[in-house]
Curated annotation (Swiss-Prot):
This is Large ribosomal subunit protein uL6. It comes from Nostoc sp. (strain PCC 7120 / SAG 25.82 / UTEX 2576). The keyword Ribonucleoprotein applies. Keywords: Ribonucleoprotein, Ribosomal protein, RNA-binding, rRNA-binding. Belongs to the universal ribosomal protein uL6 family. Pfam families: Ribosomal_L6 (PF00347).
């Protein structure tokens, strides 16, 4: 039995779960998420908990069991609490700001980079160098944060660029010169 898959999912009081065959719909204060689960995995609700079970012991069923449980747990957590990713901007003259819903980045290019958030995603900028991407769908929050980071990933020589909060960038030594002009 999958160690992750057999753990029950607790459903908070303000979250409503609807199961229709292989489709799971989760509604909460932050929004509504739905997902079609694989046919060899089933979800059942007993009171305030959800249990994900697999129908047979084939290899693919065992692989999808833990994945499906984690996806449903992320849906429940997302509509009740939400998710966020923090990004840090390092570099002279690099800054971010929010205009309307869009994130505007000045990253040393000849132009500003505008990123329009998908539905359900918000950008918050703290003191021009910290960006918080928040929303209720963990996958979209992560993809949007990766899109922002891809504008100027951290470079290994000076460490300038956009990085996740807590990300450690491996630094490289620069070129060593021959020793002055002759």
């Amino acid at each position: 039995m999958s160690r992750i898959g057999k753990r029950p999912i607790t459903v908070p009081a303000k979250v409503q779960v609807t199961i229709d065959g292989t489709k799971v719909v989760v509604k909460g204060p932050k929004g509504e998420l739905s997902r079609e689960l694989p046919a060899n995995v089933s979800v059942s609700q007993e009171g305030e908990t959800l249990q994900v079970t697999r129908r047979d012991e084939t290899r693919t069923s065992r692989q999808l069991h833990g994945l499906s449980r984690t996806l449903v747990a992320n849906m429940v957590e997302g509509v009740s609490q939400g998710f966020q990713r923090r990004l840090e901007i390092q570099g002279v003259g690099y800054r971010a700001q929010v205009q309307g819903r869009n994130l505007v980045l000045n990253m040393g290019y000849s132009h500003q980079v505008q990123i329009e958030p998908p539905d359900g995603i918000q950008f918050v900028v703290e003191n021009n160098t910290n960006v918080i991407v928040s929303g209720y769908d963990k996958e979209i929050v992560g993809n949007t944060a990766a899109k922002v980071r891809a504008v100027r990933p951290p470079e290994p020589y000076k460490g300038k660029g956009i990085r996740y909060a807590g990300e450690v960038v491996r630094r490289k030594a620069g070129k060593t010169g021959k020793g002055g002009k002759k």
